């Protein structure tokens, strides 16, 4: 590994560690870690502050996965390096240095990674999430099922490409 790549991994981890749910909660005068489920993610922000704040957190958390992986595809090219960047983004979100190594569940950030890797698989994953949510009414169940199936789809729909 070269120093440029190591620096990019450190940048990705720190960028993904920004606790947008916590920051937005504070802007609304709330400590999101002490409200609702205590999670800093979009679902808890939506429940405790409102839809607009929740959507903002969702988009910002999604970008924490999308931006580093999208640019990694052009900086490093090979699947191994891109996968390490993706992992650094999700780890940064879930174990934020700014939150004493606590964080969100990684669903939105992981979905941002997925969009950067394969828009086709991301769209199918979103449709699975939406269908599961509409049938069950549970964000958590929809997230678990769609996230589990997304990596199966990556394997079967994207395997054999020169790079992700």
Task: State what each model feature region is.
Residues 8, 12-13, 17, 21, ...:
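Alpha-helical transmembrane segments in multi-pass membrane proteins
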Residues 22-54:
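Cytosolic, membrane-interface loops and tails of multi-pass inner-membrane proteins
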Residues 46-49, 72-75, 107-136, 148-158:
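Interfacial segments of multi-pass membrane proteins
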Residues 1, 43-47, 75, 102:
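Helix-boundary and loop/linker segments of multi-pass membrane transporters
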